[in-house]
């Protein structure tokens, strides 16, 4: 009994604060580290340490719940356990944390806390020095009797168990091989005891007190096992395995230390999981799965890799909002005001949201619609989704789908794989905590496809109101109801969306803005936002509407306002520099006036030498407020204009016409240029054209050849056969951009008619429309975006197919007032509108007398 403990710990120890678990000397446990102080301790001390001493920590039990993670150091327990960190395992799911495997060495007492941040460090006094223990027994025989009594109860308890179990046999050998003074701590950590009882054993520095406290615990375990054997006599072999002794896997390299794989903290967590499963409102099928998994978890050693997977699965199941939802705000008037305040224009989109609210007032169990906002970048599709959630009073979650090429991102990974995780849909529901959020599926048109599956196909189940009430994630493997989720998708174009997915969504077009709308958006939203971000006030900067119009027309050319917002940011940064310099100059002038009187400033400026211009500039008067941003200031800040109205210059010779094109970025004007030369009747097409546009060019030249006599069109040799000894070259500028589609047909005909007639096309006319071989003009799409592009370019007359006349109702009235429209049903009408004075013919060509 007089052996001396050979362990010597440092006099200063970093403190690891635990909440419920208690580590006793000689035992081993795993603990999770996720608070700020403990994380900093692991990263600074364990991960960067190079010596054995750096792996020794002071474990302080019974500290306040680390979930609060307050800035102040909580009250610390007086006695702790010096521990050796054996293993550190890091993980980022569900949040960054480390799992430590630590072995208790000896007790210590805190003398003084030396520092609290970034992690506590204390001066400690080592206890458990057996030669220093005060012998409070009257004789040494009394301490020996306590030791023998403890040993007998320990042996009796172990012999009641199944000795065929390796862990039990190992424990029996330890009782004979380890010193008696080490057994109370080890046995207490193995048998089922509460944290309070463990804490009492830890506080018992005297060996006599530890024996006296541990013996009743052993007696209680023995009596419990006897009672269990009486009540379940037929299953005697199983009874020996049921005793609440944790499995002992191995003896560590430290004498008397045992590894405790399933510590009290884990058991408490399992009990909490069971309680959450019982009280949760999950469906019956999910509840059965959770009950089955929790039973498997109880029988599973913590060292098994599947232990963490099963535990994470159960934690996810109890955290999912199976029946938790928010109450919708169905005040249509308030919703209208909120939408108008957040977004200007977009009347069609706002009307659809208000319609949804109105129907919800009449029918509470309405399934969430599947909306898809389609429009060019920068028009506010994503922000509208956030405003819809705000209007309804729902939670909002954005899922970026651009570049996603694995269906597991949508449906989740099966739990058989290492590192499996739920899909983005289920993970988003866990994040928001309710089952009726607004989910924004951003950039749904940019989904990829790979060997891992097609995520667009996985979305079919999610976005189908008839199926998504029973959505099954591969990770959960049980059904989850998504029918209450309001899904909003965004896309730049519907061309790349699979037809099956497109069929499940309600398409709402979000066109680009007019110049007037951009001006309103700039002065209502963009400029105030930029002023706030740059610390400026309206008293320091003034941007007139004429300046805003100049930025829109000469420095940006887009359907949205994203580039416009960046230009305002550049202006605000330049003004911020002026304001900051002005404040510096005011302070410098004030100091100069105080030092030398009122005339000091003039004296300094008069005596300034040419090489000291910088000093004179420092003493110049600060700028007057507010700083006015005019055309000269724009040129200084943003540089020379990026875009000029060059339409008239480019149409100064025959063989050039202006068409209108639609792109995912919005509408734009497109020039078509033609040239002829001596040759063999070949047609050359350049400008990265698609097959459809090439066919339109061949249609145009064929129609003109068949009607050359009626329009008096000849080649350079005076022949009505336009390709006789003549080659034609058609070019579409912006050659790096791929172009395709049938809407350039009327533009190609007009361009070639100008080339062969030698007449100029009107410089204020743009056109769009598909042609047929018989000279008919067929309707095309994207009329609104094309008209807005022509308006931005300063064009005044637009030729569109007659069957597109209905699309003019979507054009804002202020744009209509600036433009005149010609609706054409055949190419005769197109040519008459494209040339000054019309395009005269000897006999008006009909639809039947054209010939090739």
Swiss-Prot record:
Location relative to the cell: Peroxisome matrix
Reactions performed catalytically: Hydrolysis of proteins in presence of ATP
Motif (Microbody targeting signal): 850-852
PTM-bearing positions, type N-acetylserine: 2
Keywords assigned: Acetylation, ATP-binding, Hydrolase, Nucleotide-binding, Peroxisome, Protease, Serine protease
Residues the record lists as binding ATP: 375-382
Occurrences of domain Lon proteolytic (ranges): 651-837
Recorded superkingdom: Eukaryota
Any GO BP: regulation of fatty acid beta-oxidation
EC number assigned by the record: 3.4.21.53
Active site: 743, 786
GO function term, MF aspect, one: ATP hydrolysis activity
Database matches in PANTHER family: ATP DEPENDENT LON PROTEASE FAMILY MEMBER
NCBIfam families according to UniProt: lon (TIGR00763)
HAMAP family: lonp2_euk (MF_03121)
Subunit description: Interacts with PEX5. Interacts with TYSND1. May interact with enzymes involved in beta-oxidation of fatty acids, including ACOX1/AOX.
Name of protein: Lon protease homolog 2, peroxisomal
Originating organism: Rattus norvegicus
């Amino acid at each position: 009994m007089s052996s001396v403990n050979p362990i010597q710990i440092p006099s200063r120890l970093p403190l690891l604060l635990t909440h419920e678990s208690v580590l006793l000397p000689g035992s081993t446990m795993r603990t999770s580290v996720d608070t700020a102080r403990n994380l900093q301790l692991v990263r600074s001390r364990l991960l960067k340490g190079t010596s054995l001493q750096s792996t020794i920590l002071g474990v302080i039990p019974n500290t306040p719940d680390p979930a609060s993670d307050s800035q102040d150091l909580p009250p610390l327990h007086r006695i702790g356990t010096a521990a050796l960190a054996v293993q550190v395992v890091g993980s980022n799911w569900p949040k960054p944390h480390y799992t430590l495997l630590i072995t208790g060495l000896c007790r210590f007492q805190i003398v003084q806390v030396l520092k609290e941040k970034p992690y506590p460090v204390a001066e400690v006094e080592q206890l458990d020095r057996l030669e220093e223990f005060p012998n409070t027994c009257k004789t040494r025989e009394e301490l020996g009797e306590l030791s023998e009594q403890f040993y007998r109860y320990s042996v009796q308890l172990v012999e009641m168990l199944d000795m065929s179990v390796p862990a039990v046999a190992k424990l029996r050998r330890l009782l004979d091989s380890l010193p008696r003074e080490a057994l109370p701590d080890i046995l207490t950590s193995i048998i089922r005891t509460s944290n309070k009882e463990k804490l009492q054993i830890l506080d018992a520095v005297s060996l006599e007190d530890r024996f006296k406290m541990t013996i009743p615990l052993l007696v209680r375990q023995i009596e419990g096992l006897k009672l269990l054997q009486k009540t379940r006599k037929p299953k005697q072999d199983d009874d020996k395995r049921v005793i609440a002794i944790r499995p002992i896997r191995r003896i560590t390299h430290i004498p008397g230390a045992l590894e405790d794989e399933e510590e009290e903290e884990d058991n408490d967590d399992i009990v909490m999981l069971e309680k959450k499963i019982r009280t949760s409102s999950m469906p019956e099928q999910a509840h059965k799965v959770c009950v089955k998994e929790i039973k498997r978890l109880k029988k599973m050693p913590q060292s098994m890799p599947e232990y963490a997977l099963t535990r994470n699965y159960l934690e996810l199941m109890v955290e999912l909002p199976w029946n938790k939802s928010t109450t919708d705000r169905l005040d249509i008037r308030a919703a209208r005001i909120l939408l108008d305040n957040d977004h200007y224009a977009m009347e069609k989109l706002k009307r659809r949201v208000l319609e949804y609210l109105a129907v919800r007032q009449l029918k509470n169990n309405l399934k969430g619609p599947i909306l898809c906002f389609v429009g060019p970048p920068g028009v506010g599709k994503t922000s509208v989704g956030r405003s819809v959630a705000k209007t309804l009073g729902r939670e909002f979650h954005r899922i970026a789908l651009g570049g996603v090429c694995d269906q597991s991102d949508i449906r989740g990974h099966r739990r058989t794989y290492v590192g499996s995780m739920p899909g983005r849909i289920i993970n988003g529901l866990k994040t928001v905590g309710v089952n009726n959020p607004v989910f924004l599926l951003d950039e749904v048109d940019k989904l990829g496809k790979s060997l891992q599956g097609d995520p667009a196909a996985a979305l079919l189940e999610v976005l189908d109101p008839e199926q998504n009430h029973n959505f099954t994630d591969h990770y959960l493997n049980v059904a989850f109801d998504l029918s209450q989720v309001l899904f909003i998708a965004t896309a730049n174009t519907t061309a790349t969306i699979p037809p099956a997915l497109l069929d499940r969504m309600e398409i709402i077009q979000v066109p680009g803005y007019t110049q007037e709308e951009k001006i309103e958006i700039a002065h209502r939203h963009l400029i105030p936002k930029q002023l706030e971000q740059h610390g400026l006030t309206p008293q320091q900067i003034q941007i007139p509407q004429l300046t805003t119009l100049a930025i829109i027309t000469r420095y940006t050319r887009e359907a949205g306002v994203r580039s416009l917002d960046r230009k305002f940011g550049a202006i605000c940064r330049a003004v911020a520099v002026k304001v900051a310099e002005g404040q510096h100059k005011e302070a410098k002038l004030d100091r100069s006036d105080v030092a030398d009187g009122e005339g000091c400033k003039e004296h300094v400026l008069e005596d300034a030498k040419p090489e000291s211009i910088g000093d004179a500039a420092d003493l110049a008067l600060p700028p007057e407020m507010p700083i006015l941003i005019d055309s000269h200031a724009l040129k200084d800040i943003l540089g020379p204009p990026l875009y000029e109205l060059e339409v008239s210059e480019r149409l100064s010779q025959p063989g050039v016409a202006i068409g209108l094109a639609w792109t995912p970025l919005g509408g734009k004007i497109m020039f078509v240029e033609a040239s002829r030369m001596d040759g063999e009747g070949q047609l050359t097409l350049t400008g990265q054209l698609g097959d459809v546009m090439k066919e339109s060019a061949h249609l145009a030249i064929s129609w003109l050849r068949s009607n050359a006599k009626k329009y008096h069109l000849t080649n350079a040799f005076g022949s009505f056969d336009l390709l006789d000894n003549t080659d034609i070259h058609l070019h579409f500028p912006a050659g790096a951009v791929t172009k395709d589609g049938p809407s350039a047909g009327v533009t190609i005909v007009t361009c070639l008619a100008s080339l062969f007639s030698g007449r100029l096309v009107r410089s204020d006319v743009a056109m769009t429309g598909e042609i047929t071989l018989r000279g008919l003009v067929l309707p095309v799409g994207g009329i609104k975006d094309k008209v807005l592009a022509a308006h931005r370019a300063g064009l005044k007359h637009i030729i569109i197919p007659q069957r597109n006349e209905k699309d003019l109702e979507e054009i804002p009235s202020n744009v209509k007032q600036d433009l005149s429209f010609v609706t054409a049903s055949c190419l005769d009408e197109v040519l008459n509108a494209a040339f000054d004075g019309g395009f005269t013919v000897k006999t008006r060509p009909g639809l039947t007398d054209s010939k090739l």
